[in-house]
A protein has these predicted regions:
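Signature of N-terminal electron-transfer/Fe-S-associated modules in redox systems
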Residues: 1-158
Length: 158
């Protein structure tokens, strides 16, 4: 099946079976940041932005992404938003293991884009299902709050 998508800013055609996982298809198409982990959507290793929302690509059948915009961590890591998130994580003392980075970064990105400042509890509720393999929940929440503060300061200057 031929599936037109925009992958990391480039219009391409994915060649895949409709029920094949998007994670597998992206990995075959040279996206090394899309990792295979738990295959149940929990670990965050395969997280991508699908139409600007974080999703576990291991749970998405390739057949439903026709004409969608897909962003992987490889591409996103070159953005100002990524720099902001990583600055917040660094301030909180977070050292990501590399395995779950996409899940944590894209979850933070989603929270940063919320129209109103979420409460600490709302942030906690949003990220508590992520794999805690390298970062405890409280530290992750602190890192996201720091990233929000950094983003707000940049917007006031800009």
């Amino acid at each position: 099946m031929k599936i037109p998508v925009t992958l990391n800013g480039n219009k391409i055609i994915l060649d895949a079976h409709s029920d094949e996982s998007l994670m597998r298809v992206l990995h075959k198409n040279g996206c090394p940041s899309v990792k295979s982990g738990c295959s149940s959507g929990f670990c965050g290793a395969c997280t991508i932005l699908l139409d600007d929302k974080p999703v576990a690509s291991c749970k998405v059948p390739a057949g439903i992404v026709r004409n969608c915009d897909i962003v992987t961590l490889d591409y996103f890591s070159k953005t100002e938003e990524y720099t902001t998130i990583m600055s917040g994580f660094q301030k909180a003392g977070i050292k990501l293991c590399g395995y779950c980075t996409a899940g944590k970064v894209f979850s933070a990105y989603h929270i940063l884009k919320m129209p109103k400042m979420p409460t600490r509890q709302e942030i906690t509720d949003y990220v508590k299902a992520l794999s805690p393999c390298c970062t405890d929940l409280e530290t992750l929440v602190n890192g996201i709050i720091y990233a929000i503060q950094i983003s707000n300061r940049r917007q006031k200057r800009g």
